[in-house]
Structure formats: C-alpha cells, structure tokens
C-alpha cells in the first residue's frame, strides 16, 4: 500500500513533457533501417512507453529483458520519438566498454538518418568535451551516450526530454536525480536491466518505477545461457572460454 501511495504521489508531483506523435526520424528508421521485424514483446513494450510519453506525466519505467532481446532497439525508438518532438536524449552506461558498444550499435542503426550522436566518457579529450558542451547547448546534438561523465556539471542540455540508464542496479537514485536536474522540468526516465527480477521483487526494489518485460528473443537469436562454476572449476571455465573464442563466439 505504501508503494502504491508513493507511486500515486509521484504521478501527481512530476508532470512530464508530452510527446504527442512520431515524426520523420522515427518513420524513416522504422521503415528503412529496422534490422528485423519487432517481436510481439517489443511491440507491447513500445505501446507502454508511447502511452507514458503522451500522458503528460513523467515516465519512470524499468525495461527488463535478456541480453539480445532487443532492449537497445526499443530505447533507440523511444529516443527518436523524443527527437521528433523537439527534445534531446541521452544514454548513461556504467562502463566505457558498454557506452562504446551503445555508441557503435546506435550509430550503425541510424546510418542514413540525420541524427547527431556523440560519445562522452572519462577518457574523452578536453577538446571533444568542449565541442559536446557547445553542441548540447545549441541543440545541434540529438543523442549523447556516455558514462558517469554525463553527470558532470558542465554537461548541460538545451532541452533534455528522455534519459535512458542501462544496467539500472549499478546506479543509485541520487545519480538518476542528478540527470533530472539537467532540466528545469524533469525528463522522462527509462532504465534497463538484463538481470531477471520477479515483478513483486521489482515493486519492492523499484517502487517508483513501472515495469516492462521483453520476454521474447528476435528471430534467429540464440538464447543466452547463464552458468555458474565454483572456484575449483576455474581451469574448466578457462578451457570453455578458449573454445568459444576460437569459434568466434562471445562469453
């Protein structure tokens, strides 16, 4: 009951930007660049997100799905909706490797579409940081992808409409709040995790978040196996890793 009361109070307190429609960028991507037909689970989640974005209340949604389920694609389409409505978007990842992966993946997906994206991490050069700051303030940068570097005071957006946080459990509520404060009005928030969380537990851990689940893999995707080994099986693990790499797979 306390969680439901908190959720009701949050909806009353925080008004959100209204993204009333999709535009050229979304449609161009959907009809020309979409790498595969969306799964029913992705379509369902997109409907939930679009409903949030058009509700007039701030979206605070947890998107849960296995590695390879298509969370990044859903996140990208959500960002395109924000951009089509005149706003900027950002993705914050816990490591430079993951931020770089998002940057490369999204850049490839957006080939041929006039969307400006940049990468900002702790190792970004001073000249690059200055260019990014200027581009953000002049609204010439649509999507910023990065690590905790996004929280720095000199990173200011002209019109931040959507914040996406990957691997939510590695960030605290205070860090989410710091991204809110980049705007006079709070942006919409979408947080993602590949960690399976039962819905009742998610309500306990993330009572301020609505929950969406992608429970279906895109066609042709091989299910990801999660395995546990004890320390005494270390050599077995190393041998398994070597074999997988030799077969050009990921571990």
Give the ranges of each region predicted by the language model:
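Interdomain "pre-motor" coupling segment immediately N-terminal to P-loop NTPase/helicase cores
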Residues: 1-28, 32, 76
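Inter-lobe coupling/hinge segments of SF2-like helicase ATPases
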Residues: 13-15, 37, 41-47, 54-251
């Amino acid at each position: 009951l306390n969680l439901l009361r908190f959720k009701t109070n949050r909806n009353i307190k925080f008004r959100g930007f209204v993204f009333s429609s999709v535009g050229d960028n979304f449609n161009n991507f959907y009809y020309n660049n979409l790498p595969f037909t969306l799964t029913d689970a992705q379509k369902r989640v997109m409907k939930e997100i679009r409903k949030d974005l058009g509700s007039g209340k701030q979206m605070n949604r947890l998107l849960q799905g296995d590695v390879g389920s298509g969370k990044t694609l859903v996140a990208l389409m959500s960002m395109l909706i924000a951009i089509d409505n005149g706003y900027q978007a950002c993705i914050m990842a816990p490591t430079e490797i993951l931020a770089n992966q998002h940057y490369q993946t999204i850049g490839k997906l957006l080939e041929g579409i006039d969307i400006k994206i940049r990468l900002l991490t702790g190792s970004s050069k001073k000249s690059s940081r200055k260019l990014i700051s200027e581009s953000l303030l002049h609204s010439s940068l649509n999507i910023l992808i990065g690590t905790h570097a996004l929280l720095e005071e000199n990173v200011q957006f002209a019109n931040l409409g959507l914040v996406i946080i990957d691997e939510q459990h590695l960030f605290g509520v205070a860090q989410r709040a710091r991204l809110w404060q980049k705007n006079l009005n709070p942006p919409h928030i979408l947080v993602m995790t590949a960690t399976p969380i039962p819905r009742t537990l998610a309500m306990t851990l993330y009572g301020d978040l609505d929950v969406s689940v992608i429970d279906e893999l895109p066609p042709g995707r091989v299910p990801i196996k999660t395995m546990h080994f004890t320390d005494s099986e270390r050599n077995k693990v190393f041998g398994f890793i070597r074999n997988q790499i030799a077969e050009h797979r990921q571990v």
